[in-house]
C-alpha cells in the first residue's frame, strides 16, 4: 500500500488555483475504454487502486473511491488512510455521483475532464450537483491529474496496426460501412462519430496493440453519407494498411485532427440549416451514448447531437458465420492448452511435490498457449489464485510477492487469450488434494447454475437480464450469491469484455435482446472471504433452436458452448446432481475428449489427466 499523500497534495494545489472544490477522476480514457494504456491510468496514479472499474473523487478535504463488488477486497487492501471506499451496490452506500454531489453543497464547484465522462453521465452528475446546492458541473479541458503526474507520466503508445483479412473478419469493410450508412439514412443524419476503440477496429477490419490485452489502437472515425474518415497517428500504418484503407475508400487523417474537424463540421451543418432550401440536412449528428462529453460539446451539444446505443457496437456483437467458426476453433486450441497446463500443474504439485507460485503457473499457461496457431497474446491478466486469494474476484498475483499454490486448497484460474480467429475467456476451479464438504457443495451449486443457463431455451426477444436467475437459482436456494454479473459479451479477436449484451442485473442488460450470433460468458461463482473462491466459466454462442411448438409464432433461442475444458471431478458432489445434469456433464466430457485428444499424441501425462477428468459421472 503506497502513500497517496504526495499526489493528493499536488492535485489539491491545482484545484485551489482553478477554484475547484471537487474533482472527479473516472477510470476510463477518452474512448470510454475499460482496459486502458498506462498513460491513462489516472485513477490508479492518484489512489493506488489498480482494478479495472471505479471512480475517484477528490475534494479539498477528503477523497473517495467507488467500485463494484468484484473489487471490494482488492480496494480495501490497496487504498491507504486518505481514502473512503464506497462499495457500490450495497444498501445505504451512496453512488459516486451522490457522494460527489453531497460535497458540493453551498455552491461549491465540481469539475471533470470532459473527455473522460460520457455526455449522458455528465448531465446526470450535473443534475445531482445542482439538486445538492452546488454550482454547474465544470468541464475542465486541461487534465489536472496529468499536470500533477508530470514527467513521470508514461508516453502514449504508438504501436503498429495490422489488417485483419476478410477470411478471418468474415465481412468486408465496404459492407460494414454501407450497413451503417443505411442506419444513418433512416434518421436523415449528417454523420456518425465512432469513439470506442474496438468499434473503430471492427469497422475497418484493423487490429492494433496500443492497450495491453486489447488488439485496438488510438483512433476515431467519422462516417457521413459520402465519406469515411479514420483519425489515427499515421506512423502506425504500413503500406498494407494504407492500401487496405484506400481500397475501401477510407480517408486517413491525424488523430489530433478529430476534434477540430468535428467543430468545423458542426459549423458547416449549422450554416446549411440556417440557409434553408432544398437538400438541407435536418437530422442531428449521432454519437454513442458512451461517447465523451467533449465530443458532444465539439458537435454542438444539445440540439445538434443525438446520443444512442452505437449501431456499430450492435452490429459487432452479432458475429457472422466466419467469426463463429473462428470462436469454435480457437476455443478448441485454447482448451488443449488449458488441459495440458492443468495436467502439468497437478503433476508438479501433487506428484513431484514441487513448489509453484501463482505467477509461475500463469507464466507456464501463457507459454503453452503461445504454441498454438494464431496466438497473439493474452486477453487479460491471468487470475491465478490459491486458497483465500481465490475469494478476491479479480485477484492479480504479483511476481515476488504472490502465494505459493497450496495443493491442499482450492485453485482458481481465470484466463484467456487473443487469437487472430477469436478471443477466449475460461475459468476453472480445481483441487489437487482432498476438498472439504463445504468446497464440494459450493462448487456443485455453481456447476448446477452453469448447466441451468447453458441448457436454457427462451423466446426471441429475451434479454440477458431475464436469464440471470438461472445461474443463481441453486445458490439462492441455499441463501448464497455472488457479487458480479453472470455473463459479458466477448469480442472476436477484440476486447474480452464487449457490449451491449450481457447476463446480469445491470440496467443495460434489459435494453438489448439476445440474438443469434451473440457470444457471451457463463460464469457463476461463490466466494467465502478469507477462505476460498469458486468460479466456473464457459463461453457460449446464441443460436436458434427447434422446439416442438411455436407459441405466438416466435422463434426460440438457446446456447452453444464453445469452451472445451473438463470440470474438476474431485469437487463434484454427485448426489446433488439430477439425472439430466449428469447426462449433460457426460455429454460435455465426451465433447471435450473428442475435440482435444488429438493434441496429445505421445503426451501420456496430459492424456491420462484428460481421460480421468472426462470419465463418466455415474
Curated annotation (Swiss-Prot):
Mn(2+) 2 binds at residues 414, 425, 537. Its EC number is 3.4.11.9. It catalyses: Release of any N-terminal amino acid, including proline, that is linked to proline, even from a dipeptide or tripeptide. Binds 2 manganese ions per subunit. Mn(2+) 1 binds at residues 425, 523, 537. One of its GO terms (biological process) is proteolysis. It comes from the Eukaryota. Its cofactor is Mn(2+). Keywords: Aminopeptidase, Hydrolase, Manganese, Metal-binding, Metalloprotease, Protease. One of its GO terms (cellular component) is cytoplasm. PROSITE patterns: PROLINE_PEPTIDASE (PS00491). It is an enzyme of class 3 (hydrolase). GO terms for molecular function: metal ion binding; metalloaminopeptidase activity. InterPro entries: Creatin/AminoP/Spt16_N (IPR029149), Creatinase/aminopeptidase-like (IPR036005), Creatinase_N (IPR000587), Pept_M24 (IPR000994), Pept_M24B (IPR033740), Peptidase_M24_C (IPR032416), Peptidase_M24B_aminopep-P_CS (IPR001131), X-Pro_aminopeptidase_P (IPR050422). Pfam families: Creatinase_N, Creatinase_N_2, Peptidase_M24, Peptidase_M24_C. Belongs to the peptidase M24B family. Catalyzes the removal of a penultimate prolyl residue from the N-termini of peptides. This is Probable Xaa-Pro aminopeptidase P. It comes from Metarhizium robertsii (strain ARSEF 23 / ATCC MYA-3075) (Metarhizium anisopliae (strain ARSEF 23)). The lineage of its organism: Eukaryota, Fungi, Dikarya, Ascomycota, Pezizomycotina. The gene is AMPP.
Amino acid at each position: 500500500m503506497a502513500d497517496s499523500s504526495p499526489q493528493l497534495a499536488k492535485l489539491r494545489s491545482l484545484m485551489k488555483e482553478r477554484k475547484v472544490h471537487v474533482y472527479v477522476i473516472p477510470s476510463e480514457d477518452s474512448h470510454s475504454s475499460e482496459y486502458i494504456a498506462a498513460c491513462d491510468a489516472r485513477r490508479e496514479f492518484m489512489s493506488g487502486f489498480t482494478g479495472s472499474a471505479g471512480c475517484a473523487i477528490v475534494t479539498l478535504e477528503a477523497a473517495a473511491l467507488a467500485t463494484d463488488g468484484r473489487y471490494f477486497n482488492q480496494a480495501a487492501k490497496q487504498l491507504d488512510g486518505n481514502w473512503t471506499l464506497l462499495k457500490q451496490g450495497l444498501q445505504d452506500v451512496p453512488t459516486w455521483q451522490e457522494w460527489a454531489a453531497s460535497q458540493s453543497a453551498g455552491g461549491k464547484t465540481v469539475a471533470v475532464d470532459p473527455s473522460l465522462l460520457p455526455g449522458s453521465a455528465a448531465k446526470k452528475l450535473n443534475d445531482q450537483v445542482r439538486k445538492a446546492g452546488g454550482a454547474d458541473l465544470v468541464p475542465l479541458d486541461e487534465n489536472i491529474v496529468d499536470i500533477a503526474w508530470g514527467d513521470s507520466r508514461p508516453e502514449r503508445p504508438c504501436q503498429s496496426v495490422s489488417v485483419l483479412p476478410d477470411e478471418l473478419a468474415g465481412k468486408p469493410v465496404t459492407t460494414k460501412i454501407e450497413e451503417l450508412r443505411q442506419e444513418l439514412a433512416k434518421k436523415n443524419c449528417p454523420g456518425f462519430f465512432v469513439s470506442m476503440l474496438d468499434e473503430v477496429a471492427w469497422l475497418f477490419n484493423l487490429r492494433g496493440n496500443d492497450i495491453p490485452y486489447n488488439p485496438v489502437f488510438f483512433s476515431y472515425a467519422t462516417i457521413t453519407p459520402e465519406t469515411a474518415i479514420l483519425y489515427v497517428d499515421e506512423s502506425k500504418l504500413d503500406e498494407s494498411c494504407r492500401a487496405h484503407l484506400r481500397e475501401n475508400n477510407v480517408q486517413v487523417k491525424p488523430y489530433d485532427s478529430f476534434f477540430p474537424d468535428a467543430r468545423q463540421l458542426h459549423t458547416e451543418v449549422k450554416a446549411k440549416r440556417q440557409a434553408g432550401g432544398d437538400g438541407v440536412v435536418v437530422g442531428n449528428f449521432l454519437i454513442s451514448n458512451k461517447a465523451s462529453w467533449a465530443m458532444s460539446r465539439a458537435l454542438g451539444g444539445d440540439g445538434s447531437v443525438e446520443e444512442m446505443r452505437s449501431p456499430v457496437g450492435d452490429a459487432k456483437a452479432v458475429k457472422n458465420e466466419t467469426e463463429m467458426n473462428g470462436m469454435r476453433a480457437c476455443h478448441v486450441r485454447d482448451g488443449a492448452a488449458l488441459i495440458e497446463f492443468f495436467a502439468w500443474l497437478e503433476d508438479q504439485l501433487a506428484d513431484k511435490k514441487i513448489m509453484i507460485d501463482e505467477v509461475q503457473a500463469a507464466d507456464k499457461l501463457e507459454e503453452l498457449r503461445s504454441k498454438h496457431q494464431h496466438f497473439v497474446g493474452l486477453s487479460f491478466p491471468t487470475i491465478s489464485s490459491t486458497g483465500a486469494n481465490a475469494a478476491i474476484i479479480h485477484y492479480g498475483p504479483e511476481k515476488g510477492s504472490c502465494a505459493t499454490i497450496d495443493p491442499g486448497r482450492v485453485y482458481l484460474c481465470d484466463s484467456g487469450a487473443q487469437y487472430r480467429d477469436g478471443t477466449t475467456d475460461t475459468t476453472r476451479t480445481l483441487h489437487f488434494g482432498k476438498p472439504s464438504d463445504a468446497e464440494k457443495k459450493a462448487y456443485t451449486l455453481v456447476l448446477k447454475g452453469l448447466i441451468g443457463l447453458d441448457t436454457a431455451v427462451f423466446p426471441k426477444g429475451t434479454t440477458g437480464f431475464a436469464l440471470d436467475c438461472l445461474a443463481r437459482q441453486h445458490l439462492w436456494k441455499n441463501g448464497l450469491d455472488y457479487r458480479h454479473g453472470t455473463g459479458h459479451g466477448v469480442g472476436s479477436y477484440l476486447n474480452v469484455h464487449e457490449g451491449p449484451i450481457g447476463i446480469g442485473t445491470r440496467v443495460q442488460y434489459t435494453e438489448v435482446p439476445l440474438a443469434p450470433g451473440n457470444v457471451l460468458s457463463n460464469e457463476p461463482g461463490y466466494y467465502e472471504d478469507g477462505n476460498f473462491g469458486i468460479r466456473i466459466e464457459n463461453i457460449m454462442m446464441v443460436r436458434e433452436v427447434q422446439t416442438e411448438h411455436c407459441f405466438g409464432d416466435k422463434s426460440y433461442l438457446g446456447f452453444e458452448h464453445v469452451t472445451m475444458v473438463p470440470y474438476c471431478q474431485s469437487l463434484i458432489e454427485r448426489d446433488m446432481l439430477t439425472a439430466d445434469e449428469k447426462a449433460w456433464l457426460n455429454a460435455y466430457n465426451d465433447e471435450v475428449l473428442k475435440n482435444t485428444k488429438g493434441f496429445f499424441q505421445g503426451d501420456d501425462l496430459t492424456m491420462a489427466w484428460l481421460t480421468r477428468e472426462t470419465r463418466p459421472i455415474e
